[in-house]
């Protein structure tokens, strides 16, 4: 069942980190604020830190460790740990939409069955998953070496630059990220994200 998604973000926040550990820590702070039904759209070129970021989300959510990119299986479900920091919290559904060329192919993997009860993170999801929820949080990761960080005006251009799985065989084995500066852009869409998440600590003051 499709919904009418928000087309324009209610806010945008740019954060800068210098190491993979900082990327992980920022994501863990965000993960602690997430709740069942949240949809995150994760975008970043090869080596941008998508897996590190998702691992941090998992830590903040209190789900089972061992998060890797679900490139070949499309979807991995990481269950909440009863003895973790958030017992009874939502599971993490981690999706790699790289090989899915359209919204209809997203529907074929039945994310709607877990969407309301889990936190769903979709890599390469822009232009494919917006119809699943009226609210979403977009997370763009940019390496200092590679594409320049973009703001709201460049979001459409970034989507156009995402690789088409029909035209390339490049895979993202983003399992170990280098310690190098990264820019992380968060955008909130819809009523769930009417305000910025409370990230706490040093991240609150990041320009």
Predicted feature locations:
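N-terminal pre-Walker A segment at the start of P-loop NTPase domains
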Residues: 2-29
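Short phosphate-coordinating micro-motif centered on Lys-Gly-acidic
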Residues: 2-6, 13, 112-207
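Phosphate-binding P-loop
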Residues: 31-37
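Hydrophobic anchor at the beta1->P-loop junction of P-loop NTPases
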Residues: 40-42
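P-loop (Walker A) phosphate-binding loop of NTP-binding proteins
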Residues: 45
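Conserved lysine of the Walker
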Residues: 50
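Conserved nucleotide-sensing/catalytic segment adjacent to the nucleotide-binding pocket
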Residues: 66-71, 76-126
């Amino acid at each position: 069942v499709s919904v009418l998604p928000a087309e324009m973000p209610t806010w945008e926040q740019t954060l800068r980190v210098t190491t993979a550990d900082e990327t992980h820590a920022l994501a863990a702070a965000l993960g602690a604020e997430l709740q069942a039904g949240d949809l995150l759209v994760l975008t970043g070129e090869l080596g941008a830190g998508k897996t590190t970021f998702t691992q941090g989300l998992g830590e903040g959510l209190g789900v089972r460790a061992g998060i890797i990119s679900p490139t070949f299986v499309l979807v991995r479900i990481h269950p909440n740990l009863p003895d973790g920091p958030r017992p009874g919290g939502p599971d993490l559904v981690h999706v790699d939409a790289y090989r899915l060329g359209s919204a209809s192919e997203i529907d074929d993997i039945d994310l709607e069955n877990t969407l309301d009860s889990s936190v769903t993170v979709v890599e390469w999801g822009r232009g494919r998953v917006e119809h699943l929820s009226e609210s979403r949080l977009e997370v763009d990761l940019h390496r200092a070496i590679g594409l320049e960080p973009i703001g709201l005006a460049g979001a459409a251009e970034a989507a156009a630059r995402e690789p088409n799985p029909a035209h390339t065989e490049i895979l993202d084995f983003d399992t170990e990220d280098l310690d190098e500066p990264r820019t992380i852009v968060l955008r909130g869409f819809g009523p769930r994200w009417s305000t910025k998440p409370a990230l706490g600590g040093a991240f609150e003051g990041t320009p």
